């Protein structure tokens, strides 16, 4: 029987363009090269689950699953998924669906949350933004995920939210020079709103930033985002251990 430290985690990144997966150990070390397949169109639950199943079959074994999903999630249930372009995800229990598909315990978080868990230092207030098909955010204090507003769908101008202002479609439409002007403005806003100790930027468009960044801003390696799957399970184990300890303490009173 495996101990928690020996168990293998299938870490999945569900994106608007590609779905990627790899297997990690509990420390976040890659045990296999990551695999990817294009996100299907339309990206409804059945088609996305089929792609995930194809990816899972590329790995010989794993004991748990962690997945990052591009949308708002509550208790493992998808509430919105604007970057997958389909209302079919509303109130879809992705956790249950993956557990039934892969027959393994599963944790689901927003994709930016998974990235944030992977790369933050674990000290102070840290903000992660992802620049891919859309704009994602994760906020962590001392390495622990915090509830926060879904910034992507807040207005940044009179007519555009953050997704529409600096997302992949807009990058292609306005070009790199104008996109960088917008990103400079966005970072300035985030600095004032969050007063973060450190900002991390990842995603396919992060490499397109060409202006000088503050010393407390880091461009993260996209590949490192998978490691959030191990961190997610680590936090789950700590939370469960804390609950168990609290129950034992109350029984002794």
Task: Walk through the language-model features, giving the residues of each.
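Glycine-rich beta-strand-to-loop/alpha-helix junction loops that act as flexible
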Residues: 65-71, 131-133, 197-206
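Short beta-strand scaffold segments in enzyme catalytic cores
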Residues: 19-23, 71, 117, 135-140
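A short acidic Gly-Thr/Ser loop motif
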Residues: 12-17, 129-134, 204
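Helical "lid/coupling" subdomains associated with nucleotide-phosphate turnover
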Residues: 150-191, 217-241, 251-253
């Amino acid at each position: 029987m495996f101990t928690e430290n020996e168990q293998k985690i299938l870490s999945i990144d569900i994106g608007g363009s590609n779905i990627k997966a790899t297997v990690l150990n509990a420390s976040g070390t890659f045990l296999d090269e990551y695999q990817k397949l294009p996100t299907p169109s339309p990206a409804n639950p059945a088609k996305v689950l089929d792609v995930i199943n194809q990816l899972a079959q590329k790995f010989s074994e794993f004991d748990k699953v962690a997945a990052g999903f591009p949308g708002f999630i509550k208790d493992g249930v998808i509430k919105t998924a604007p970057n997958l372009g389909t209302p079919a995800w509303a109130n879809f229990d992705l956790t249950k669906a993956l557990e039934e598909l892969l027959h393994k315990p599963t944790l689901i978080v927003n994709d930016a949350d998974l990235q944030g868990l992977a790369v933050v230092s674990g000290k102070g207030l840290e903000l992660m933004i992802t620049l891919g098909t859309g704009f994602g955010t994760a906020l962590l204090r001392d390495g622990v995920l915090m509830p926060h507003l879904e910034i992507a769908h807040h207005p940044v101008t009179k007519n555009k939210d953050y997704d529409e202002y600096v997302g992949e479609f807009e990058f292609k439409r306005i070009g790199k020079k104008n996109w960088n002007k917008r990103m400079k403005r966005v970072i300035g806003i985030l600095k004032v709103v969050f007063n973060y100790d450190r900002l991390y930027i990842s995603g396919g468009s992060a490499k397109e930033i060409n202006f000088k960044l503050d010393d407390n801003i880091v461009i993260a390696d996209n590949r490192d985002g998978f490691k959030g799957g191990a961190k997610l399970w680590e936090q789950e184990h700590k939370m469960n251990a804390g609950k168990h300890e609290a129950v034992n303490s109350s029984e002794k009173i």
